[in-house]
């Protein structure tokens, strides 16, 4: 067969944002001595477009067989030093570390989301009307759940606080109380609705899905820890997809990196449109959550700067 030109793939990636994302993420990893790699996703909450996605340490596509992580380099050196005659074992360890660095952490690796998950618990409780913006929650540093004492992340106590203040403080006992008001059945229902029990369907290979406490196995202790982002594990792409639904009117959108496909004559043969999987919360609840989250970042105690428009990047402090 005669060779013929293929089609061109146009991406949603913004090259400037991607460059900035890679640079700042690498700086963050260096400054915090992160030994488990890190990732960052920048997403348009209104459309599902992925504007930037990076993993650090990454690798050079022109030399993908080298090991770039300093930690992994030391691991290989130590293995060779301890096992000088075990060439087969060294090669197996090298292959394992090389394949790990090839993985896109944003879609393949699981983590406990921590405090960023509190928007899911909070929005679900608002939607069910078991709380409102004026509801109050008391933090005395710790809270007793059955035979467990669960502490807040701070060494002190937040005292009595309304919902917005509890979100600003990222208060664990407050969100345990919110989870208790929501209850196991409703909590698990919204956990499913926000997409945490299934892959997002992003148009990239190798997407994983989270590991979570099943509803039939969940007790009041598990509900407590899950309510502030512990016990369940998710992928970063699952978390940012759910977070986007919280603020975009309540719509769970399928994320994507492909914008369109154009043939060699310049004809658009496929355009990737916004795909709404479901509406999780109402427009009204979503508006309340936007109000709360804008207050969080604008008031003292908030953790990230306000960014105009619905571009979304998620993060969480390691001690939360």
Regions found by a protein language model. Give the residues of each.
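Beta-lactam-recognizing serine transpeptidase/beta-lactamase-like catalytic domain environment
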Residues: 1, 13, 46-116, 120-315, ...
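Conserved, well-ordered alpha-helix/loop/beta-strand core segments that scaffold catalytic motifs
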Residues: 1-38, 46
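Conserved beta-strand and immediately adjacent loop positions that scaffold enzyme active sites
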Residues: 39-41, 258
